[in-house]
Amino acid sequence: MQYKTVIFDLDGTLLNTLDDLAGATNYALTQHGLPARTKDEVRWFVGNGIRKLIKRAVPAEASAELQEQVYATFNTYYKAHCNDKTKAYDGIMELLAALRKAGCRTAIVSNKADYGVQELVKQYFAGQMDAACGEREGIAKKPAPEMLFAVMEKLGAEKNATIYIGDSDTDIETARNAGIPCIGACWGFRGRDFLVQHGAKLLAENPQEVWKLLQD
């Protein structure tokens, strides 16, 4: 296998977190007298961090102060409810097991708040990730490549032996900015057509296809 380090996005790639993200978003909105959003709307709001999620979810006329209040409420609620309905996508655990058996290092780079990343890694991927990096102060979030670079440096990974897997245009752009290839996860929050429109060169309909692509 050419790739010795396989780095994954989290939301919409390893885990289906949409129900919990939508639940926390709507809890935060309604606590401040704002209208709730549909799950499909939230699906398109996620991917660029919680602040951007909240900015997209609140009405356009909402003040910066109100946005900040909704953001704080979201964080408090989501910390306690980030794993109420979340689950791994079918085939993910088998893919990770196969990669580990093949001697690959596996890691996560996500724009999800780091507290959520670490909690979900502990719940789902204990002993299966060599590194996990979520959004936090002091490091630029995706599509800037710094988070990928930080994980690669920690693992001693070389660019020509590293690949990123994600379900969004942000993931494609992040990999491009880092100078590594990307596999688009068509089972995630965006879908095949969207990924193709945003420049995906490698696409997988399911985790089993990821494994096949990694063998080529």
Q: What name fits each language-model region?
A:
Residues 1, 101-104, 155-161:
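Glycine-rich phosphate-binding loop signature in dinucleotide/nucleotide-binding domains
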Residues 1-44, 55:
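Active-site neighborhood of HAD-like aspartate-dependent phosphohydrolases
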Residues 28-29, 49-63, 120, 151-152:
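Helix-loop "lid/cap" segments that line or gate small-molecule binding pockets
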Residues 55-94, 102:
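Metal-dependent phosphoesterase signature
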Residues 84-87, 113-165, 169-178, 192-194:
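Substrate-recognition "cap/lid" segment bordering the active-site pocket of phosphatases
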Residues 92-122:
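Substrate-recognition element of Asp-dependent hydrolases with the DxDx(T/V) motif
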Residues 202-206:
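Short acidic-hydrophobic, aromatic-tinged amphipathic segments that line or gate anion-handling sites
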